Design a protein with these regions (language model features):
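Polyanion-binding surfaces on beta-sheet-dominated domains and ring/shell assemblies
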Residues: 2-324
């Protein structure tokens, strides 16, 4: 992701700025809250100021730059697959457990995924009911993202149609919240799915027609999931006239509205969701969609490169885990 810096200088009189802030304050007092209104636009902010045009944020990143991310797989021993992702101050742990279950009536020849999200007490701001509501919101978002038929090959999880299938229980643990949790969680889920290994099974039938399931004892005789079409979430936060990716907590506090876009490795958008009390005009939405597709493709490439490198290292790769 390339950092771009554009400097625009324009002389603005003190009287002009005073008039602008007076109008902005009047809007706050009249509305009580923003309610989707772009205060900077309605108050008549002078056009062409440096804050509108510069591709520079407080921490030195460009508007389309992510913070440094650390990805590690196979960090929990008693799971079928696991991953830990640290994105800035945000810390996510995902564990996947494959268990046998019964296929759903509407899809008798497919397995399925179940998502559970726990907001750790290590994040004081997420204690109590607030954490429960956030966990439910994250789980519902993941269900929506993975509702696309091509995201995961669920037919490969079927053992015996209408009778047995693999159910993947995806447990998401939010260890620390430092902004942009949806993107970090989607990265961790994809990495954990890549790391998941499901034992191969054989269906044996005796003379009486009774079926038995036999699991392979060989740890290398397993099924690997194809994660090429698993989408990643790109959250774009609208701040003033611009939108940024991978917002920090401070930037999220300044944003009136954000757009969550799930993007595949080919840049296709599989779902979208607006969060926040503010509104987004059509032009901004189209710009954010284009940015999400562009940034999403780069994110997939970078993540897949890391996953492939870890895969090639095999057992020789150094493990950091929770003691690093």
């Amino acid at each position: 992701m390339t950092t771009r810096s554009i400097s625009v200088h324009q002389d603005i009189s003190t009287a002009s700025w005073r008039s602008f802030w007076q109008k902005a304050a009047a809007l706050f007092l009249r509305e009580g809250q923003l309610l989707g209104r772009d205060v900077f636009r309605d108050a008549g902010c002078p056009v062409g100021t440096a804050s509108r045009a510069e591709d520079l944020r407080v921490d030195g990143r460009g508007c389309e730059d992510y913070r440094c991310a650390e990805v590690e797989t196979d960090v929990v021993s008693n799971t079928s697959g696991s991953a830990r992702v640290k994105l800035g101050e945000t810390d996510i742990l995902v564990g996947i457990k494959a268990e046998m279950g019964t296929p759903k009536l509407e899809k008798p020849d497919e397995g399925y995924l179940e998502f559970f999200v726990d907001c750790s007490s290590n994040s004081p701001e997420l204690e109590g009911r607030g954490g429960e509501e956030l966990g439910t919101d994250i789980a519902n978002t993941l269900y929506r993202v993975f509702s696309c038929e091509n995201s995961v090959d669920l037919k490969s999880l079927c053992i015996n149609p209408k009778e047995h299938c693999w159910v993947l229980y995806v447990d998401v643990l939010l260890l620390e919240c430092g902004g942009n949790i949806f993107d970090a969680i989607s990265i961790a889920v994809k990495a954990a799915l890549f790391n998941t290994r499901i034992p191969k099974v054989r269906v044996l039938e005796d003379e009486e027609g009774t079926k038995e399931i036999e699991l392979s004892d060989d740890p290398y005789d397993c099924i690997r999931l194809n994660v090429d079409e698993v989408p990643c979430i790109v959250t774009l936060s609208k701040i003033g006239y611009r939108h940024v990716v991978d917002a920090t907590l401070q930037e999220e506090a300044c944003s009136l509205a954000s757009l969550l876009i799930s993007v595949t490795s080919k840049g296709a958008i599989s779902s979208m969701k607006k969060v926040g009390k503010g509104s987004l005009d059509p032009e901004s939405i189209f710009e954010m969609m284009e940015t999400g597709q562009r940034v999403g493709k780069s994110l997939h490439i970078a993540l897949q490169k890391i996953l492939d490198e870890e895969e090639n290292l095999g057992t020789s790769r150094p493990k950091v885990g929770f003691l690093g």
